[in-house]
């Protein structure tokens, strides 16, 4: 009987872009690979790879306690049904709920990947502090299993969770980023045309989108030749998402070009002179690694 790997990731598209090679490697090593995500167009691609998919009742930023309890119960039941040899948890909610459920289920080992601590650790005010304390308490419960390791992409996030008492240093592993397929991203000659400055990210305030637009306005006022382009989609499920009206205003002002979501990001970077990500909190951004290879 094949050993079982269960990967729980919030978004199917994120799995395809950041964790697919891990699942393929496990499959080639003889594991039966299960992927649990919320619904999305990329689920078809997951199934086409030969993985078994499970649909999670997951709202990435939902705060309804009944919905959250239902999600926790669903994950717990899934763990009892599959009894995975390895449970790989990726991003905040899967790490928290999967980690808690794993302490109450027959799971042999857990690998949690913290790619960033998110807006919860940046927000200010009394409400934000209370919510942050709640999340810290959940992390301590989620990461308490003995046979568990936590992958961090930078030492700051690792030190933050150690400082909260969520894990010990011995349980932490530092791996800087998700890596890049070098066959898809190769160096390209720089164009002599007007410099193109690109920000590729989900259109969130904590990704630095407002700062990017402000920088474009400043250079425009100073008559500095530069073409600013924004690549990415709005993220209505995230409380820091840019509003559609803001995006439309930027389009009408002509300060920046809004390209929307693009699958051909390698070709976008090939036409760029500068790639920026003025984000407030990240693990180690894959987009900058991709740009570093391409530019």
What are these regions (language model features)?
Residues 37-41, 200, 227-242, 258:
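Glycosyltransferase donor-sugar binding loop
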Residues 261, 280:
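Aromatic "clamp/platform" in nucleotide-sugar-dependent glycosyltransferases that forms part
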Residues 29, 33-70:
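Conserved nucleotide-sugar phosphate-binding/catalytic loop shared by glycosyltransferases and other
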Residues 89-95, 114:
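Short His-centered aromatic/hydrophobic patch
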């Amino acid at each position: 009987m094949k050993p079982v790997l269960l990967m729980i990731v919030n978004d199917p598209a994120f799995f395809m872009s950041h964790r697919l090679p891990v699942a393929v490697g496990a499959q080639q090593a003889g594991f039966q690979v299960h992927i649990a995500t919320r619904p999305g167009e990329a689920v078809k691609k997951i199934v086409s790879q030969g993985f078994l998919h499970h649909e999670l009742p997951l709202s990435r930023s939902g705060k309804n306690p009944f919905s959250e309890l239902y999600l926790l119960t669903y994950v717990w039941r899934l763990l009892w049904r599959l009894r995975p040899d390895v449970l790989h948890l990726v991003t905040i909610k899967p790490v928290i709920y999967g980690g808690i459920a794993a302490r109450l289920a027959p799971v042999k080992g857990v690998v949690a990947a913290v790619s960033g601590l998110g807006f919860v650790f940046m927000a200010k005010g009394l409400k934000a502090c209370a919510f942050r304390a709640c999340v810290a308490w959940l992390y301590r419960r989620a990461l308490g299993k003995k046979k568990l390791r936590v992958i961090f992409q930078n030492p700051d996030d690792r030190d933050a969770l150690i400082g909260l008492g969520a894990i010990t240093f011995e349980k932490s592993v530092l791996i800087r980023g998700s890596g890049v397929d070098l066959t898809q991203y190769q160096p390209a000659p720089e164009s002599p045309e007007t410099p193109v400055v690109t920000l590729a990210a989900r259109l969130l305030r904590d990704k630095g989108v407002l700062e990017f637009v402000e920088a474009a306005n400043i250079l425009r006022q100073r008559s500095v030749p530069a073409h600013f382009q924004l690549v990415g989609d709005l993220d209505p499920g995230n409380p820091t998402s840019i509003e559609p009206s803001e995006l439309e205003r930027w389009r009408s002002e002509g300060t920046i070009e809004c390209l929307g979501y693009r699958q051909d990001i390698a070709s976008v970077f090939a036409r760029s002179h500068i790639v920026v990500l003025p984000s407030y909190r990240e693990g180690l951004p894959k987009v900058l690694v991709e740009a570093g290879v391409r530019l």
